[in-house]
Regions:
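Rossmann-fold dinucleotide-binding core
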Residues: 21-91, 95, 99
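Charged, alpha-helix-enriched surfaces in structured cytosolic catalytic cores
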Residues: 39, 66-70, 104, 118-121, ...
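Rossmann-like NAD(P)-binding element
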Residues: 1-21, 29
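Predominant activation on well-ordered alpha-helical scaffold segments within soluble catalytic domains
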Residues: 32-35, 76, 103-111, 124-128, ...
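Active-site-proximal catalytic alpha-helix in oxidoreductases
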Residues: 53-62, 82, 87-115, 125-141
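NAD(P)-dependent Rossmann-like dehydrogenase/reductase catalytic/cofactor-binding core
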Residues: 84, 115, 120-219
């Protein structure tokens, strides 16, 4: 895949106007992996969307070490003009920022099922009917800022030791086959494969309703 991107961006760099920004949509390949040898590498970056991209507005912009700040700024302005919500990573990280945050949650969810702490259905409920309700209109920093009388510093003083102890227990997780099979089996019991397409359409309708609500109730 990296080689395909290298070849494609070499063609784009040769054929496109010098002032055009070249952005790649990718979930895990940084711009530095396929643009280093390009004469126009300073105008290349990653614009990482979120699934489904036609409904979720966030776009993560990540340049290579040689990407010109103007290329990122112009891309951010364009995304904002067309109704997206651009965020900018100031340096490359493996998997990009959104995927890293999602990976931490998904890995812990699998660990909890593996260790017999909670069922697949109840883990989903913890996010759907707990964390997700707040996260649909505020991020983790604003959440903790409101969760202690003195804001973030007070939250860290009160809960930092507990959070530190929890994260110390979270060794790297390898998505072992037995746990993956268990999670998949519980999901197929809850939602047969034949119903996935309909459920995906339902998800899209719920996302549209949430977006409409957010437009009517600006934060």
């Amino acid at each position: 895949r990296v080689e395909v991107k290298r070849e494609l961006f070499a063609e784009l760099d040769a054929l496109s106007p010098p002032g055009a920004v070249l952005a790649s949509s990718t979930s895990g390949i940084p711009a530095s992996a396929f643009t280093e040898a390009l004469p126009g590498r300073a105008r290349c970056l990653v614009a990482h969307p979120v699934n489904p991209p036609y409904l979720v507005p966030l776009v993560e912009l990540v340049g290579a070490p040689w990407t010109a700040p103007d290329a990122v700024a112009r891309t951010r302005a364009l995304m904002a003009r067309v109704g997206q919500v651009p965020v900018t990573a100031m340096k490359e990280t493996r998997g990009f920022v959104l995927n890293r945050m999602q990976a931490a949650l998904v890995a812990e969810a699998f660990r909890l099922v593996r260790d017999g702490v909670m069922s697949v259905e109840d883990v989903d409920a913890c996010v759907r009917d707990g964390l997700g309700l707040r996260w649909s209109f505020m991020g983790p920093f604003e959440t903790i800022d409101l969760n202690a009388p003195g804001g973030v510093a007070d939250y860290a003083a009160r809960f930092g030791p507990l959070l530190g102890a929890i994260t110390a227990e979270q060794a790297p997780y390898d998505f072992d086959a037995a746990t993956v099979e268990k999670v998949a089996a519980e999901r197929r019991a809850a939602l047969p494969s034949t119903a996935i397409e309909d459920r995906s359409a339902w998800r899209d309708r719920r996302l549209m309703a949430l977006l409409a609500h957010r437009r009517d109730q600006p934060g």
